[in-house]
């Protein structure tokens, strides 16, 4: 039976030649998936699964380490002596799962003053990770960021604009993009019961804030996507060769709601599991306006992305700090 979630081979886009016939056909498939579903799986993405598996091992080792080790990276809300506010570790007492939020690992204490955003933080990973693990996390962040840029440039091509405008929206170190590890322990009870269909959930129904989310889910799965028309829920099947992509509120805004953010949730499961999403989010000082994709001239009006993000995060309990 054909899956509700389409699978797209994006290898024609990897050489940055967006004008070839194969690349144009691939971009059209992405456009259709974004409009019809808001979710799709990608293969041929160029990221080695040895790298992904290694990153997952690093995440699992961290979550299975001592509470003291994890709390070294917890935000100030939970550990008063810590300086970080936005990034870091949050315990499962918050919303039924543990998490670790990492920003761009290129950020160093010496250059923090350059960035006028509370969301740009230096997180000292040496407190909880060894140097090889930190290097692996940094490399993966860079690789998944580059992959996200390729997908976004594909969207830009749909609007017949120069793909270089991507640099106006996304700048390393200024980006608020987040590499997150979600760790679902042996949950003794669901986070909530769906009001729509009574299903027990391990993660509440929500949409994401950024342009794209690129997710790796382990074979235990549990992710479901809602059909916007009939409101039914569909499983996202596990594919060990694929990464899962979904549209977020920032892309919905920039595209004038052509590409809508899609509701998704995670089913309650007593088995331990982990997912690794990457939230591709613009630079904090990028001015969000629909003319970025749709207009021929730049417009001074708009909302800075960090303010857009602040409004979006209000619905997530783990960010109520």
Question: Where are the regions a protein language model picked out?
Answer:
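Peripheral, non-catalytic segments flanking oxidoreductase cores
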Residues: 1-321
């Amino acid at each position: 039976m054909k899956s509700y979630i389409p699978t797209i081979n994006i290898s024609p886009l990897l050489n940055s030649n967006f004008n070839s016939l194969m690349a144009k056909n691939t971009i059209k498939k992405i456009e259709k998936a974004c409009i019809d579903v808001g979710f799709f799986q990608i293969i041929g993405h160029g990221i080695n699964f040895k790298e992904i598996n290694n990153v997952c091992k690093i995440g699992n080792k961290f979550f299975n380490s001592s509470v003291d080790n994890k709390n070294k990276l917890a935000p100030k809300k939970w550990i008063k002596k810590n300086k970080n506010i936005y990034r870091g570790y949050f315990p499962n007492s918050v919303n039924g799962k543990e998490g670790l939020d990492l920003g761009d690992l290129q950020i160093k204490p010496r250059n923090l003053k350059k960035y006028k955003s509370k969301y740009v933080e230096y997180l000292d990973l040496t407190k909880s990770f060894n140097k090889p693990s930190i290097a692996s996390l940094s490399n993966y962040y860079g690789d998944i960021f580059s992959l996200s840029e390729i997908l976004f440039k594909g969207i830009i091509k749909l609007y017949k604009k120069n793909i270089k405008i991507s640099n106006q929206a996304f700048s390393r170190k200024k980006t608020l993009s987040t590499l997150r590890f979600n760790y679902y322990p042996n949950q003794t009870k669901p986070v909530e019961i769906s009001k729509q269909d009574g299903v027990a959930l391990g993660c509440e129904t929500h949409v994401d804030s950024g342009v794209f989310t690129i997710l790796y889910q382990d074979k235990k799965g549990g992710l479901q996507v809602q059909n916007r028309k009939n409101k039914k829920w569909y499983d996202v099947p596990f594919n060990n060769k694929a990464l899962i992509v979904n549209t977020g509120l920032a892309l919905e805004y920039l595209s004038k709601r052509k590409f809508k953010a899609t509701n998704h949730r995670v089913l309650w499961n007593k088995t331990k599991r982990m997912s690794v999403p990457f939230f591709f989010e613009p630079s904090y000082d990028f001015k969000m306006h629909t003319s970025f994709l749709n207009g021929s001239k730049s417009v001074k009006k708009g909302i800075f992305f960090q303010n857009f993000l602040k409004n979006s995060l209000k619905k997530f309990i783990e960010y109520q700090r």
